Amino acid sequence: MKHIFLRISVIILFCSYLSTGCKKHEELPPYHAKGTIISVTGGCYGEVVLIEVENPPRIGLSGTFSFIGNTDKGVTYHNAIGVPYFSKSGIPDAVPQKVGTRLYFEYRNITEEERGQSTLFSPDPPIVCLAIYGPPSANYYIIKNIISFK
């Protein structure tokens, strides 16, 4: 009887261990995301902070981005969003805008008025570029609030 109880207990513990070992995406509230800054562009590429979003999946785009003349240091991403420089959307200076910073944030869609605003993703004052460069391909949003960062 002890052996049967022991075997059943071991099987239950083993199954519990397997079920907790599976990696699951936690359910975030609507318009909340977690991700890592993978690139910060400027100048002729536009002023964009590129964030690889881990959760929720499928809010961004996949692609590769590299600066002209530096193609061996390209950035490949699978679920990236682009946001304006933090200073342009009211995010405090205490939040570092540098590659590798992990963010948990609240975001929103860009309004039509903001879409027409030329300085949201561009340098102010405008600069003259000798060629046509473009920002990384990504879905673009506005960060409303940084909940945590590290």
Give each language-model segment a name.
Residues 1-22:
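Sec-dependent bacterial lipoprotein signal peptides
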Residues 16-39:
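Bacterial Sec-dependent N-terminal signal peptides
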Residues 42-55:
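Short aromatic-glycine-enriched beta-strand elements
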Residues 55, 107-111:
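A mature extracytoplasmic/lumenal domain signature
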Residues 58-70:
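A short macromolecule-binding patch
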Residues 79-106:
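Short nucleic-acid-contacting surface segments enriched for D/E, G, S/T with interspersed K/R
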Residues 111-150:
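OB-fold/S1-family single-stranded nucleic acid-binding modules
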